[in-house]
Amino acid sequence: MAEAPSRMQQNYDWQCEDAINTHIQLCLYASYEYMSMAVYFDRDDVAQENFKRFFLTKSHNCQTSAEMFMHLQNKRGGCSSLQGIARPERDSWHGGFQAMECAFHMEMLINQSLLNMHEVAKEKGDPHLCHFLEQNCLDQQVDILKEMSGYLTNLRQMGAVEHNLAEYLFDKLSLS
């Protein structure tokens, strides 16, 4: 038996609903990947507590973001369509610089997803979704990118790509 359309759904195009579902999936994948990073830095042979804490917080933030979009989906009368989450491409990170670089690229993907969703909302005449993204996501995501870009610059300038001591100091002094 087919589901009846929601009575709540008004001015909510299926492409907006689809863009939100795509973003939810990306957030859940990012949360999973950040959890993998946190677990790596918690290993006894790596033991970088602040990197672990940083990536664990990122994992929780992505999970919270996915939940926020699921709530929005329900509020608008849409349907969250959850898919299987692919496992992270790697379980071992060759240090903080590589993990931070990967995290930065993940945040760039999240930013692009938000921008794509905003564009779809504008094209489909959905001021509610545009406002939601502008108030809750877009500026915050730019701040995240700025912070992580600064971390990468600091790690690079300290020579963390070649020297473990620089990475250790970054963990102790910058991420604490």
From Swiss-Prot:
The lineage of its organism: Eukaryota, Metazoa, Chordata, Craniata, Vertebrata. PROSITE patterns: FERRITIN_2 (PS00204), FERRITIN_LIKE (PS50905). CDD domains: Euk_Ferritin. Residues 10-159 form the Ferritin-like diiron domain. One of its GO terms (molecular function) is ferric iron binding. Expressed in the testes and spermatogonia. Keywords: Iron, Iron storage, Metal-binding. Signal peptide: none annotated. Belongs to the ferritin family. One of its GO terms (biological process) is intracellular iron ion homeostasis. Fe cation binds at C27, E107, Q141. It comes from Mus musculus. InterPro entries: Ferritin, Ferritin-like, Ferritin-like_diiron, Ferritin-like_SF, Ferritin_CS, Ferritin_DPS_dom. This is Ferritin heavy polypeptide-like 17E. Pfam families: Ferritin.
